[in-house]
A protein has these predicted regions:
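Generic alpha-helical scaffold signal
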Residues: 51, 55-58, 67, 71-78, ...
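Extracytoplasmic mature domains of secreted/periplasmic and thylakoid-lumen proteins
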Residues: 89-92, 96, 100-168
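Long, well-ordered core segments of solenoidal/helical folds
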Residues: 21-40, 75-93, 126-145, 185-208
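Solvent-exposed loop and edge beta-strand segments that line ligand/cofactor-binding
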Residues: 20, 28-55, 85-104, 148-161, ...
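Bacterial Sec-dependent N-terminal signal peptides
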Residues: 1-20
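Residue-level preference for long, well-ordered alpha-helices that form the structural scaffold
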Residues: 20, 53, 73, 120, ...
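Well-ordered alpha-helical scaffold segments within catalytic/enzyme domains
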Residues: 55-71, 105-120, 165-180
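Extended ligand-binding clefts on enzyme/binding-domain cores
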Residues: 158-220
Length: 220
């Protein structure tokens, strides 16, 4: 019986240590084990793609790494970021002319990387500056809301708020001239309030996923 309990002891210790790890850390370790290279996240199979799914997941990785001191996770994110952007700050296959708000979201990790490595590598600041330029010329509805994409003219999507506005707000906080901040923050708030007004369905009390100002798309 004593030998039996001695055999179980290492297993019990391992289970105990695992239980002490936050689920966020355990999830990250699982993702990194299954995808040693972040280009394999979201089923990309090693294909580089500037997309919100990978960018959003890696932003969560960075947040957890900062909370729980995991330098290997930071390096994992940085490897992907450096693969996606040249030293000049040019992003792989990114085209501003597509005016896709989904392509604003992944740039958020470059704020964090600039804070950590900006003295060594200027690309992180250059990426955020370039993505910010898209916001300046992003097509809008008559009421001032961002189109979701150039290929979806006049359409405002609820998920577009999250794709663009956290980046827009963070960039404003960090870099906008003080005299411009109030108007920029007001623009951010307007995206939410106007979007909510135009997507709200009084019949159900819910918000539709999207609104088409031109009324040409049947589903929104």
């Amino acid at each position: 019986m004593k030998k039996f309990f001695m055999m179980l002891l290492p297993l019990a210790v391992a289970v105990s240590l695992s239980a002490q790890e936050p689920y966020s850390v355990r999830m990250i370790r699982s993702e990194m084990k299954r995808n040693p290279d972040a280009t394999y996240l979201d089923g990309r199979n090693g294909e580089r793609k500037w997309n919100y799914t990978t960018g959003l997941e890696l932003k969560a990785f960075l947040d957890a790494a900062g909370r729980y001191e995991m330098p290997e996770v930071v390096q994992y994110v940085r490897d992907w970021a450096d693969t996606m952007a040249t030293e000049k700050g040019e992003v792989y296959k990114y085209k501003k002319s597509n005016y896709n708000v989904d392509h604003i979201c992944p740039a958020r990790i470059y704020f964090d990387l600039h804070d950590m490595y900006g003295d060594q590598d200027k690309r992180y600041r250059r990426v955020t500056r370039m993505i910010r330029e898209q916001i300046d010329s992003q097509p809008r509805t008559k009421s001032g809301e961002f189109w979701h994409k150039q290929v979806y003219p006049h359409q405002v999507w609820l998920d577009g708020f999250y794709m663009a506005l956290p980046f827009y707000a963070e960039y404003t906080r960090r870099y906008a001239p003080k005299e411009q901040r109030d108007s920029l923050y007001a623009d951010i708030v307007h995206q939410f309030t106007a979007g909510a007004e135009n997507t709200f369905d009084p019949a159900t009390g819910l918000y539709r996923h999207a609104w088409d100002e031109s009324r040409s798309m049947f589903w929104c």
